[in-house]
From Swiss-Prot:
This protein is involved in the repair of mismatches in DNA. It is required for dam-dependent methyl-directed DNA mismatch repair. May act as a 'molecular matchmaker', a protein that promotes the formation of a stable complex between two or more DNA-binding proteins in an ATP-dependent manner without itself being part of a final effector complex. Residues 364-375 have a biased composition (Low complexity). Gene3D superfamilies: 3.30.230.10, Histidine kinase-like ATPase, C-terminal domain, MutL, C-terminal domain, dimerisation subdomain, MutL, C-terminal domain, regulatory subdomain. Keywords: DNA damage, DNA repair. InterPro entries: DNA_mismatch_repair_CS (IPR014762), DNA_mismatch_repair_MutL (IPR020667), DNA_mismatch_S5_2-like (IPR013507), HATPase_C_sf (IPR036890), MutL/Mlh/PMS (IPR002099), MutL/Mlh/Pms-like (IPR038973), MutL_C (IPR014790), MutL_C_dimsub (IPR042120). This is DNA mismatch repair protein MutL. NCBIfam families: mutl, PRK00095.1-1. HAMAP family: DNA_mis_repair (MF_00149).
Length: 619
């Protein structure tokens, strides 16, 4: 067969295969055209699920008579005129394919009138060459599009259409998505002559919430948390449901919009899912209605035939921005503040133990908290905000196969060679010979956060949160070199008082040694880097607490600051497992060997089983 140019009708039908998937696709394209025309009221009339009739009437700006024929031609649009326009597109449509594609698989009639015209005009295309006929008509200012007998000339496509009810449900969902995107537009949807949906335009926030309840249901509105988050040219607003009360029905509500355009973007969904994963079970999904506003130059919307997906030029920045925005509002809602309490100062850890450990524990971003009286109760990481688990009834079972394998590997690990100590270090620090010792064998987990150990033939109970706090303090305490700082992708900007600013400036050197880097101006401080153990914490709460602590101090020492931070970090383990406990103890043995040799009372306590055993021997 020789190469030849396809007839216009056939070419349009091929293009319609991408644009016109089902009646709901037609409704989406036509309603978006009405929105681009500035309509504030759109009426959608459907018959037989859209197979017989789709009528879209709006009060937009209308189309001039001279442009009606072009409106039905391929690649004809009023939205863009150059590549620069495409790269900064803000309208919903821009390709100029929708009307031509729809008219090639249906009987389409376009009637429109502008405010400057005294009469309306009607256009329709027919024939093999899709010739357009224009004639006068009666119509108010605005546009009406009628699509009759969809897929009448493509029987194969019509055969794959579902039942009338199913097709209308898809149309109903499209209108719901558009109504969520444009609260300022009235949308009326009717089916077979019966009014089904009426979404009236609203402007005030209270009215928006009522419309949100009408669109998403009262259960979602009751659990919805408001999000207002901004950084530079990025803005995130909307609602996310409380993950602790998300049901399977609520999880179906997942709507996200980029610059007013409805999206099904994997990057956005992943960021939201990651922010909520700690509060959701493995088989549950978050519920949300979110609006992302971004510089149009930073997003490419021309990557999907139906414009369902976009590509961000700085995808990691957008991901972390959405993640932190959602996580921030979840933490503010879910974590109740705990009362402040004075804590006894813990002895400073010996910096030389970092050298003896023989490895960099900054690769393990965990955190710790004293169970007695923590000052800081929220976390912004993927592990933050968990509720404390019930204690004794949830004791862990015996070894699992994977955990036992981890434990056997740890037992086979040879003790690292001890570095030679300088004479002054030998007198100032405890002997590191204890590093070759261990806490013993982990038998089981008791009460969610205690490990039952067998050590030297005796049974001991070890507080895992306390061990974790000691480990974090050792990780944060600078040794011969400062702690490595991790730059924040989105710097944290906080307003501070003159007293707090003065304290920060005085403590800048020890904070830098701890890996906390900041810049200050007249009334604000911008946190630009933190050590890795702090990356998974809610810095919006932890950093102000730290600034308040520094403002109360007269002297600033990196060790004392590291101790305070370690005591106020949020633990990532509400319920410890055997594998987690074994890994933690192995890290503590390597990094804090003096705790193995002389454990403090708050860390390890012996369990007297002899009296119990003697009682069992009585007949």
């Amino acid at each position: 067969m020789p190469i030849q140019v396809l007839p216009p009708q056939l070419a349009n039908q091929i293009a319609a295969g991408e644009v016109v998937e089902r009646p709901a696709s037609v409704v989406k394209e036509l309603v978006e055209n009405s929105l681009d025309a500035g309509a504030t009221r759109i009426d959608i009339d459907i018959e037989r699920g859209g197979a017989k009739l789709i009528r879209i009437r709006d009060n937009g700006c209308g189309i001039k008579k001279d442009e009606l024929a072009l409106a039905l031609a391929r690649h004809a649009t009023s939205k863009i005129a150059s590549l620069d326009d495409l790269e900064a597109i803000i309208s919903l449509g821009f390709r100029g394919e929708a009307l031509a594609s729809i008219s090639s698989v249906s009987r389409l009639t376009l009637t429109s009138r502008t405010a400057e015209q005294a009469e309306a005009w009607q256009a329709y295309a027919e024939g093999r060459d899709m010739d357009v006929t224009v004639k006068p008509a009666a119509h108010p200012v605005g546009t009406t599009l009628e699509v009759l007998d969809l897929f009448y000339n493509t029987p194969a496509r019509r055969k794959f259409m579902r039942t009338e009810k199913t097709e209308f449900n898809h149309i109903d969902e499209i209108i719901r998505r558009i109504a969520l995107a444009r609260f300022d537009v009235t949308l009326n949807l009717s089916h077979n002559g019966k009014m089904v949906r009426q979404y009236r335009a609203v402007a005030q926030d209270g009215q928006k919430e009522r419309r949100l309840g009408a669109l998403c249901g009262a259960p979602f509105l009751e659990q919805a948390l408001v999000i207002e988050w901004q950084h530079g040219d990025l803005t995130l607003r909307g609602w996310v449901a409380d993950p602790h009360h998300t049901t399977a029905a609520l999880a179906e509500i997942q709507y996200c919009y980029v610059n007013g355009r409805m999206m099904r973007d994997r990057l956005i969904n992943h960021a939201i899912r990651q922010a909520c994963e700690d509060k959701l079970g493995g088989d549950r999904q978050p519920a949300f209605v979110l609006y992302l506003e971004i510089d149009p130059h930073q997003v490419d919307v021309n990557v999907h035939p139906a414009k369902h997906e976009v590509r961000f030029h700085q995808s990691r920045l957008v991901h972390d921005f959405i993640y932190q925005g959602v996580l921030s509002v979840l933490q503010q809602q879910l974590d109740a503040p705990l009362p402040l309490a004075e804590e006894a100062p813990a002895p400073r850890h010996i910096p030389e133990n970092r050298v003896a450990a023989g490895r960099n524990h900054f690769a393990e971003p965990a955190s710790a908290r004293e169970p007695a009286a923590p000052r800081y109760s929220t976390s912004s990481g993927a592990t933050g905000g968990r509720q404390p688990a019930a204690s004794w009834p949830h004791a862990q079972p015996g070894y699992q196969k994977q955990q036992g394998e981890v434990y056997r590997q740890l037992l086979q690990t040879p003790a690292p060679r001890q570095p030679a100590l300088a004479p002054e270090a030998e007198t100032a620090a405890p002997s590191l010979a204890g590093h070759s010792q261990s806490f013993g064998r982990v038998l089981t987990i008791v009460g969610a956060d205690c490990a039952l150990l067998e050590r030297d033939g005796n049974i001991h109970l070890l507080a895992l949160p306390v061990a974790e706090r000691w480990l974090r303090q050792a990780q944060l305490t600078p040794g011969q070199t400062p702690v490595c700082a991790q730059p924040l992708l989105i710097p944290l900007r906080l307003k501070v008082s003159a007293e707090e600013k003065s304290a920060l400036e005085k403590a800048q050197t020890p904070l830098t040694d701890l890996g906390i880097e900041f810049q200050s101006d007249a009334q604000h401080v911008t946190i630009r880097a933190v050590p890795l153990p702090l990356r998974q914490q809610n810095l919006q709460i932890l950093i102000p607490e730290l600034i308040g602590y520094l403002a109360q101090q007269s002297a600033f020492d990196a060790g004392n600051i590291a101790q305070w931070i370690a005591r106020n970090l949020m633990s990532e383990h509400p319920q410890w497992t055997m594998a987690q406990a074994i890994t933690l103890l192995a890290d503590v043995e390597r990094l804090c060997p003096q705790l193995v040799k002389a454990p403090p009372g708050g860390l390890l306590q012996p369990v007297d089983l002899h009296s119990v055993m003697n009682a069992l021997k009585h007949e």
